[in-house]
Amino acid sequence: MSRVTLSRYLIEQTRSHNTPADLRFLIEVVARACKAISHQVSKGALGGVLGSLDSENVQGEVQKKLDVISNEILLEANEWGGHLAGMASEEMDNAYQIPGKYPKGAYLLVFDPLDGSSNIDVNVSVGTIFSVLRCPDRNGDTGDLGEDAFLQPGTQQVAAGYAIYGPQTMLMLTLGDGVKGFTLDRELGSFVLTHDNIKVPESTKEFAINMSNQRHWEAPVQRYVSELLAGETGPLGRNYNMRWIASMVADVHRILTRGGVFMYPRDAREPDKPGKLRLMYEANPMSMIIEQAGGAATDGSQRILDIQPTSLHQRVPVFLGSKEEVLRVTAYHRG
């Protein structure tokens, strides 16, 4: 039986599900950019790409060399193809305007070019997260694209995915009809379908959270985690294992493939900030993927995909993964 490449899968989606050709081409370009990023990541110290720069991004976070390299790869790969009206990135304060010499398309691309980059110097898996939205009708306006065009709830995503750069490079993708996993065949130079119709187990015995922040959590999270730690003699009646990689892509990938709950709650240290993770290019695409795999994703009080964004770099608390556990911790928040 012949192997199904990403290109073949997307062509078949165009035939059977009327996936627009422009969306197919866009996903293929993003995938090629992810291959280029994977190549840069794999060089490590040999390529002189490790370490930090003297600059900070809009979040006030020190930029790694590979943050900037990955961001440039995605911008340069996607700006000229005619599929996009604009882009936005964790590494840029404002929306990226498609240069006037290139045609503009119907979609918006939002991304975290290198999630988990704080771990890159110690050779931990990192990744790229992306979300695709339709650009609202601009009624003939040819001026710069404003931030408002991007401020759409996650339910409006037409595609979402992430690439994980680990022992293998994988691309996890949803077009709104389930989740597929593709592994990069370096000999072919193509992503090949290796994981079909991925489903998150409804219940689990694993959880991912940064326990060092426990003293700062709100009461519902304190309660839930204490019940997890109580094991089979506690109210949940079973033992749980904790896993924490400190790379959202790596933690969510493990949960997507074998079950679990990922938590990044708000805490008391920065009460004016509702969370650490960004809604538009971290929480929304990951939530779409998890929901399409049968899981759930909330901010503790509501479904993440229903949140109406108010700013491009808006932060939210995140609870996602196996449905049973996400609904339990959400119920604790609701009282």
Swiss-Prot record:
NCBIfam families: PRK09293.1-1, PRK09293.1-3, PRK09293.1-4. The lineage of its organism: Bacteria, Pseudomonadati, Pseudomonadota, Gammaproteobacteria, Pseudomonadales. InterPro entries: FBPase_C_dom, FBPase_class-1, FBPase_N, FBPtase. Mg(2+) 2 binds at D112, D115, E282. It is an enzyme of class 3 (hydrolase). This is Fructose-1,6-bisphosphatase class 1. It comes from Ectopseudomonas mendocina (strain ymp). One of its GO terms (biological process) is fructose 6-phosphate metabolic process. It catalyses: beta-D-fructose 1,6-bisphosphate + H2O = beta-D-fructose 6-phosphate + phosphate. The gene is fbp. CDD domains: FBPase. The keyword Secreted does not apply. GO terms for molecular function: fructose 1,6-bisphosphate 1-phosphatase activity; magnesium ion binding. Its cofactor is Mg(2+). Mg(2+) 1 binds at E90, D112, L114.
